[in-house]
């Protein structure tokens, strides 16, 4: 669903910024 898509975007954004996914 939409939440899953947003979660993926947030994870990718964190990875691009060099931050480890917090989940």
Curated annotation (Swiss-Prot):
Q: Which GO terms describe its cellular component?
A: extracellular region
- UniProt signal peptide: none
Residue ranges of coiled coil: none
Tissues expressed in: Expressed by the skin glands.
Tell whether Cell membrane is among the UniProt keywords.
no
- The reply to whether Iron figures as a keyword in the UniProt entry is no
Q: Where in the cell is it found?
A: Secreted
Sorted alphabetically, which keywords does the UniProt record give? Answer: Amphibian defense peptide, Antimicrobial, Secreted
**GO terms for biological process?**
defense response
Q: What is its main location?
A: secreted
Q: Say which family it is in.
A: Belongs to the gastrin/cholecystokinin family.
* Described purpose of this protein according to its UniProt entry: Antimicrobial peptide.
Name used for this protein in its record: Caerulein precursor fragment R6
Provide the species name. Xenopus ruwenzoriensis
């Amino acid at each position: 669903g939409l939440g899953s898509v947003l979660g993926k975007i947030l994870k990718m954004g964190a990875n691009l910024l060099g931050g480890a996914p917090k989940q």
